[in-house]
UniProtKB/Swiss-Prot annotation:
Binding site for carbamoyl phosphate: 65-66, 115, 143, 146, 271-272
GO molecular function, one term: amino acid binding
Subunit structure and binding partners: Heterododecamer (2C3:3R2) of six catalytic PyrB chains organized as two trimers (C3), and six regulatory PyrI chains organized as three dimers (R2).
Keyword hit for Transferase: yes
Keyword annotations: Pyrimidine biosynthesis, Transferase
This protein's name: Aspartate carbamoyltransferase catalytic subunit
Top-level division of the source organism's lineage: Bacteria
Amino acid sequence: MTQNTFFSLFPHQHLLGIKDLSVQDLTILLDRANANVPFLKKSDKKQSILHGRTQINLFFEASTRTQSSFELAGKRLGADVMSMAIGNSSVKKGETLVDTATTLNAMKPDILVIRHSCAGAAALLAQKVDCCVINAGDGAHEHPTQALLDALTIQRTKGRIEGLTVAICGDILHSRVARSNILSLNALGACVRVIAPSTLLPASIADMSVEVYNTMKEGLKGADVIMMLRLQQERMTGSFIPSIREYFHYFGLHKENLAYAKSDCIILHPGPINRGVEIASDIADGPQSMIHTQVEMGIAVRMAVMEALLDSRLKASGEKK
């Protein structure tokens, strides 16, 4: 299938959140990402799809997996990739996000990838620049490419998403990963559960079309997929749990709690992992863990997203590839 066939019905020029995508949009991106996976296993991994195009990564929050994944995805497609060193930039001198955006826009990039601590930062940027904008995480709001790579991991491992029971466990309140995954997995036909102490659940959880559990025993019963989330202590301003030790006992994934799920369930984690806090080392490194597969799928997904957005923008502008 050619690139044009994949993206002929994809209308978006930015990826700001899963909430903006239809089931058809999700399917297009996942199908293209799935087609990218075999290519990533070849010795020669470089394509020329984005040759002559410029990608700028603008990360205002620390990142290892996501930033390096976007860098590799862009380079695999042949783009010129520049990652801004925020610590050495004018942002540290008081420059606003909008001023930074307009400065970068003057450099005529084709793709701008942003991670920021403020919800809505990517959407604001998209209004100020003339290129494709990809949200790599905005506060506790959304992380769309993480949800896409999680969906691809599940789909390739389990053969489907529709009809599966997916349990998302941990700090739901502060997690942009949880929000994006709830949206995508619900849209793709999964039964989504969340498991957390009441202090780590958002007030809006009742409106998210999920089943809510306050114990791992009940929440993991019959689960096909377990997605563990770390405690985001950098976003916490009060006391949300009695102690780390107690939290791990009741809400961590260890052998005792894992036994409640299906014997063939798979385990996901967006990283970074806090071993002994939300997941035991033997589980994170065990045969049911798909954590390294998620990293691999991340490159395939981000390649697909950049291809799709740029293809849509070029069609809208009438510019040749």
